[in-house]
Regions:
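Long, internal scaffold/assembly segments composed of regular secondary structure
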Residues: 320-323
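Charged, compositionally biased non-catalytic regions
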Residues: 96-119, 222-225, 229-234, 243-244
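C-terminal anchoring/interaction modules
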Residues: 1-59, 134, 142-179, 183, ...
C-alpha cells in the first residue's frame, strides 16, 4: 500500500473517526429497519428456512414434523401503500419569492428553470421513494447536487452536398446532462452525527456508496478522483485503487432485505465492490475509497453553506434523528393477527382431516386410506380398533378477537376501510364514512405537510443556490404562452433565454400546500360548473371565471379556447362625438334600434289586431330613448 503524506493522513483520520462514531447507532437503526422491511414485504421465518434449499423437498419434509400454516396478513403493506399515493401523486407547484430588489424581476426566470429541472428528473417519483422510506423505516433521505454527464452519441445528418439524403454521423461526445438534481439516498447507507437530531445541527454526515471497478476508473479518467494518472503528486495509482476492497461487504447490508424479497443469500461470496465514504460537514467534502485513500477533497459542493442532504420523518420524535415509521406502532398487532389467522387455519385443517387412533395389532397402517369410494375390510366392530379423536370447534370469540385486532390497527394507523375505498355496505352511514375519511385525511395531510417542509422546500433552496452558482452561460427554455384564439396551434409555446444575470438576487422558496396530493376530479368538475355560472354575472370578469372553470375541467391552456370580447366604447365618448358632429344622441339610438329591427326576424302578433293606440287616434308617440350606454366597436 502506498505511503500517504501528512495531509492525506489527516483527511483519512477525520473521516475514519466520524465513521467509527456513527456506526454503532447506525447498526441499531439497520437492525430495526430490517424487521420493518420484512413486515412490509410480508416475510415469514418459514419462507426464510425454505429459500436456501435448491430442492425444496427437504424443507417440506422437515416442516411436516411441525406442521402449521404460516399466514401473513399484509396490513403493514396496505397501510404504507394507502398513505403514499395520497401524499405524493403530482409534482409540487413551487413558488419563488423575491427577498431583495435584484430578485424582483428574476423570480419568474428562476421558477422556469427549477420547473424544467424537476420535470426532467421525474421529481414526483423521487419524492415518492423518499416518502416511502420514511413511512417504512422512519427515515427518508434526499440529496441535492449538480450532475454533469457526457456520453457518446450518433445522430442523423444530411449528407455532404445532398441535402435530401441523411446518414449517421460520426460518434461524438456530447453533454447528456448538466443540471441540478435531487436523489433518493438509501437510509442503510446514510450515517449521521449521533449527537444530532436533524441535519441542521449535525456536525457531519457520511454517504456510503458502492462502486464497481469500471465506475472507479471512470471517475479517475474524469479527474474527479485523484491518482497519479491525473495528479503526479498523488502517492497512489489507479492500479492501487482497483486492488483495494470494501471494508464492509455490501451483502452484509443487503442480505436481510434480499432474503425478505425471496432471494438466496446463503451462498458464500465476496463482493467485488469498492466502498466510498462521502463525508460532509457543511464546509467541505472528503471522499475516502475503501477506508484507505482520500481520493477527493474540496469545498462544499452545495450552493448554500449547509450540508446538502435532507431527511423526512413522518412522525418526529424530539431529540432523535430517526422518527417513528408507520409500521413500528402496529408491528406487534401484525404478529398477533398472523398468529390468530394461522391458528384458525390449523383448526380448519384438523376439522377437515380428522386424526384417528387405531389398534396397530388389528389394522395395517397402509390400509388406512381415506377418500371417495374407499373401504377397509374389517372383522368386527370398527369402533373397537379405529376411533376418531374429537376436535373442539373454534370458539366464536376468535372472530371477535380478530375484529378487535383489526380495529386496533386501524385506530393506530388511521387507515380504515372507508379510507382505502372499500365498500362498507349498510354498516356505515354516509356521514360516518365522511367523518372517518376526514380524520384520516388530516393525518395524511400532516405527513404530506412534513414532506413539503422537510424535503421539497429545503431542496428548492438548494436548487436556487445551485443554479446561481453553476449556470454560467445563457440557456434556452420552452415555456407555454397565452395562445392566439385565431391560431389553430394550442397549446402555444415560446422560447425564453435565461442567463446568469437573470437568476441573481436573494430568493425564497415556498410550495403550494397540497399540490402533491391527488386531484379530486369529481370535486373539480363541480367547482367548474360553479365558475361557469358565476361567469354570467355582469359584475364579475367573465373571461377569468371561464378560464378558471376550463382549468378545473382539465383543459390545457384554456385561454386559447376563450373568444376575445368586442371592446366597448364608453357612452360619454359616444355622446361627445355625436355632439361634435351635430347629431342628437337620441336620434343615434333610434337609428341603432332600426338596424336591430331590420336584422331581427319579425315577431308574430299576439292577437292579429293592429298595434296599440292612444285612445282613437294614431299610435302614440314614444318618448325618445335614453342615451346609449356603450357602443361595440
Amino acid at each position: 500500500m502506498p505511503v500517504l503524506d501528512d495531509a492525506d493522513k489527516q483527511l483519512l483520520d477525520v473521516v475514519e473517526r466520524a465513521y467509527r462514531r456513527s456506526e454503532p447507532d447506525h447498526k441499531t437503526f439497520r437492525d430495526k429497519a430490517d424487521e420493518f422491511y420484512r413486515l412490509y414485504r410480508g416475510f415469514s421465518d418459514w419462507r426464510q428456512e425454505q429459500t436456501p434449499y435448491r430442492d425444496q423437498d427437504d424443507a417440506v419434509s422437515e416442516a411436516q414434523e411441525e406442521w402449521g400454516a404460516e399466514l401473513f396478513i399484509p396490513f403493514c403493506f396496505s397501510t404504507v401503500e394507502t398513505i403514499i399515493p395520497r401524499m405524493v401523486s403530482n409534482g409540487p407547484r413551487m413558488i419563488v419569492v423575491p427577498r431583495d430588489e435584484q430578485a424582483l424581476g428574476n423570480v419568474r426566470n428562476m421558477k422556469l428553470v427549477i420547473d424544467a429541472q424537476q420535470k426532467q428528473i421525474n421529481y414526483d417519483l423521487i419524492l415518492q421513494s423518499i416518502g416511502k422510506d420514511g413511512l417504512i423505516y422512519g427515515l427518508g433521505v434526499g440529496k441535492t447536487r449538480w450532475k454533469f454527464e457526457q456520453r457518446i452519441q450518433v445522430k442523423a445528418q444530411a449528407a455532404p452536398g445532398l441535402p435530401n439524403i441523411f446518414q449517421e454521423s460520426v460518434p461524438t461526445t456530447v453533454t447528456a446532462f448538466d443540471d441540478a438534481v435531487a436523489e433518493r439516498v438509501d437510509p442503510y447507507d446514510f450515517m449521521w452525527d449521533p449527537l444530532s437530531d436533524a441535519v441542521e445541527n449535525a456536525e457531519y454526515v457520511i454517504h456510503r456508496m458502492w462502486l464497481g471497478p469500471a465506475a472507479v476508473k471512470r471517475l479517475v479518467d474524469q479527474g474527479i478522483y485523484r491518482s497519479q494518472e491525473n495528479d503526479p503528486s498523488c502517492p497512489w495509482t489507479l492500479e492501487d485503487l482497483l486492488a483495494g476492497r470494501a471494508r464492509t461487504q455490501r451483502s452484509n447490508v443487503w442480505d436481510q432485505r434480499l432474503s425478505a424479497e425471496g432471494y438466496n443469500t446463503e451462498s458464500t461470496r465476496q463482493d467485488a465492490l469498492h466502498e466510498a465514504w462521502e463525508f460532509h460537514d457543511g464546509q467541505r467534502v472528503i471522499t475516502v475509497l475503501d477506508a484507505s485513500y482520500p481520493v477527493q477533497a474540496g469545498p462544499n459542493p452545495s450552493g448554500l453553506a449547509t450540508i446538502p442532504f435532507q431527511i423526512y420523518r413522518p412522525t418526529i420524535v424530539g431529540g432523535r434523528f430517526v422518527g417513528i415509521s408507520e409500521i413500528e406502532p402496529i408491528r406487534h398487532l401484525q404478529y398477533e393477527i398472523n398468529t390468530l389467522r394461522s391458528q384458525r387455519r390449523d383448526a380448519a385443517t384438523l376439522a377437515l382431516m380428522r386424526t384417528f387412533a387405531y389398534n396397530e395389532t388389528a389394522v395395517d397402517p397402509q390400509d388406512l386410506v381415506f377418500g371417495p369410494n374407499m373401504g377397509i375390510p374389517v372383522s368386527g366392530d370398527p369402533r373397537d380398533f379405529l376411533f376418531p379423536i374429537p376436535v373442539p370447534e373454534l370458539p366464536n370469540s376468535s372472530y371477535r378477537e380478530e375484529q378487535a385486532i383489526i380495529d386496533d390497527i386501524q385506530r393506530t394507523s388511521g387507515i380504515s376501510d372507508p379510507v382505502q375505498g372499500v365498500d362498507t355496505g349498510a354498516s356505515e352511514t354516509a356521514t360516518g364514512v365522511q367523518l372517518v375519511q376526514a380524520a384520516a385525511g388530516l393525518r395524511i395531510q400532516n405527513k404530506a405537510r412534513l414532506l413539503e417542509t422537510q424535503i421539497i422546500v429545503t431542496q428548492g433552496y438548494e436548487f436556487v443556490a445551485l443554479n446561481q452558482r453553476r449556470i454560467l452561460t445563457s440557456r434556452s427554455y420552452s415555456v407555454p404562452t397565452k395562445p392566439d384564439p385565431n391560431q389553430q396551434y394550442i397549446p402555444a409555446w415560446e422560447i425564453v433565454h435565461i442567463g446568469p444575470a437573470e437568476l441573481m438576487g436573494r430568493m425564497a422558496v415556498e410550495v403550494e400546500g397540497g399540490s402533491t396530493a391527488p386531484e379530486n376530479v369529481p370535486q373539480n368538475r363541480q367547482d367548474a360548473m360553479q365558475f361557469f355560472q358565476l361567469s354570467q354575472d355582469p359584475r364579475l370578469d367573465g373571461e377569468k371565471l371561464l378560464v378558471r372553470g376550463l382549468t378545473l375541467m382539465g383543459v390545457d391552456q384554456p385561454e386559447g379556447y376563450v373568444k376575445a370580447l368586442n371592446p366597448q366604447v364608453p357612452a360619454t365618448q359616444v355622446e361627445g362625438f355625436l355632439n361634435a358632429v351635430g347629431i342628437a344622441p337620441h336620434r343615434f339610438a333610434q337609428w341603432l334600434d332600426e338596424q336591430q329591427a331590420t336584422s331581427a326576424p319579425p315577431a308574430p302578433l299576439s292577437s292579429g289586431g293592429p298595434p296599440p293606440v292612444n285612445g282613437n287616434g294614431p299610435p302614440a308617440e314614444q318618448p325618445p330613448p335614453p342615451a346609449p350606454q356603450g357602443v361595440p366597436m
